[in-house]
Regions:
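A structural boundary signal for the start of the first folded domain, especially the loop/turn
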Residues: 2-169
Length: 169
């Protein structure tokens, strides 16, 4: 009886361990609240953003990460950012309230990935306005650091229930 059970369980265990080994690793390793793999931020700005995101998490419980990647590797930014946010397990598991700001300068793409628990606050329209009105003018001027500062600042203002600063279109 025990031998039969082992004969049935061993192939299942082998399949499971193989699947775990084959699970895709995140495209970028989570090393902190600011993960600047594209090198768009100077160290003082990255440090200031890290402190601001830590304060946001202490005050609201929302875990937000800012990430830059040199390239999306041929993937669509929505797929890339969703995979990244899931692999990093951002936010509370119970509240699903993680938030990711992703910038891919090679493809000239920006995405705000919002956990389901924040979708009533960080609606698609809000995210679109932040990207188009707060960030894109800075990107167009060749200043990605200011774009990231403006976008993340607007996101934090929304999360703190303060109206985001309006920028003329």
């Amino acid at each position: 009886m025990m031998r039969r059970l082992l004969l049935v369980l061993l192939p299942l265990l082998a399949a499971c361990s193989g699947a775990a080994a084959d699970a895709p690793k995140p495209a970028i390793e989570l090393t902190g609240r600011v993960v600047d793999k594209a090198g768009l931020l100077d160290s003082a700005t990255a440090t200031a953003l890290t402190a601001r995101l830590a304060r946001l998490e202490r005050q609201t419980g929302v875990q937000m990460v800012i990430a830059t990647t040199p390239t999306l590797g041929g993937k669509a930014i929505n797929d890339y950012s969703l995979r990244l946010a899931r692999s990093w397990a951002l936010g509370s598991k119970e509240r699903n309230d993680g938030l990711l700001l992703l910038v891919a300068p090679t493809e000239r793409k920006v995405r705000i990935e919002v956990g389901k628990g924040l979708e009533t606050v960080m609606k698609d329209e809000v995210c679109d306005q932040i990207i188009r009105r707060m960030m894109m003018p800075h990107f167009a001027a060749g200043d990605p650091q200011s774009a990231i500062l403006a976008g993340s600042g607007a996101m934090i203002e929304v999360l703190e229930h303060r109206p985001a600063r309006k920028v003329a279109a």
